Each structure stands twice: as structure tokens, then as C-alpha cells.
């Protein structure tokens, strides 16, 4: 039941091809007043925070625990490889099932994967398994998020509206990278940021109830 797909209707104010082209300010006003769009953008902020924190700081986390830089490099390579599989699969599933509910599953699985990774003893097996799982979940949010934007407003202004959503992703990316480094400089570990990534997974699940 969690994956039954609803149908979205594009608002005529945006999609009507017979209307004159809207400017950026007008599109921004329409988006600002569309609450599900705001929730979607906030959810994408979570994605940016998590992937940049892991992409930048996971190799350092492994080095702190006695693993070689090669292990961190292989981790990133596996993430990149399985990201291809995950992104393609997410796009395929998004054509068949509810995109917001799929995003809820993705953020929830990210949180569970992080909890499992932190709970299990660190070994090359757990590191590479985590890399594969996170690779599948890495940017699988992108086709689903863009698909929701298209369902909300139609495709006429998809590039502009997706760019607005992606801006929040980049805000999250900044804080994922910056806070990770700041926290490590102050405390010598990433414990607070790990807790934040888990909490943000819960937030990511909750906000997509309203999309």
C-alpha cells in the first residue's frame, strides 16, 4: 500500500501553453505559495547534507579509524558505480509508484543504513557494503524529485523550478561539508554530524508526507 501512485494535476497558472511566458519572479511567487513544493525543497536539502558529508568526510572518518586512504577511495568508487544502478532504478520505479512515498523509503533506508554502519564493527566488509547501499540510495532522489516538480507544475518551467529545488540541495551540501569539518576540528570526531544525518533522515521521511 505504501507504493500506490497518486496522480498529480499541473496548475493551469504554470502549465497553460497559451499564456505568455512567466518571468522568474512570477514563477518564484507561484512556487513559494505552493506548500508541497516547499516541503519537497526542504527534503532535498537533506539529500545535499548527507551526500556531501559522506563524500567529503567518510574517507577521513575511515582514516581516523586506522584504514588506508585506498579504502576510502574504493568506498567512493563503489558509491559512484552503484549510484548508476540506484538512479536508473528510482526513475523506473517513479513511473510506476508514488514518488513521494518512494522518497520516504529512500530517506528512511539511508537512516537505517547509517545506523547499521555505525553499530557494526568497522571492517572492509562493512565499509564496502555500506558503500554499495549508499550508492544505490545516493542520487536516486534526483529523478523522483524532478518528477514530482513536473507533476506539480508541468514541464514548461521544469528547468527553472528544478533549479530552485536544487538550490536547497546545495545549501544542504554546504552545511554537510562545512559542519563536518568544523565539528571534527573542534571535537576530533564526527559523532554530532552522524547524529544529524540520522535525524535528517527522519526529517526527510516526515516532510514527504506533505508532498
Regions inferred by a protein language model and the residue ranges of each:
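C-terminal transmembrane helical hairpin of 12-TM major facilitator-type secondary transporters
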Residues: 79-83, 89-148
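C-terminal membrane-cytosol helix-exit motif in multi-pass small-molecule transporters
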Residues: 1-16, 207-211
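Interfacial helix-cap and linker-helix signal at transmembrane-aqueous boundaries
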Residues: 62-63, 93-94, 179-188
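A membrane-interface helix-boundary motif in multi-pass transporters
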Residues: 182-200
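Extracytoplasmic gate region of multi-pass secondary transporters
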Residues: 32-92, 176
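Juxtamembrane intracellular "pre-TM" segments in multi-pass secondary transporters
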Residues: 11-39
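Loop-to-transmembrane helix entry/capping segments in MFS-fold secondary transporters
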Residues: 69-70, 155-165
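Paired intracellular helix-loop junctions of major facilitator superfamily
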Residues: 149-158, 188
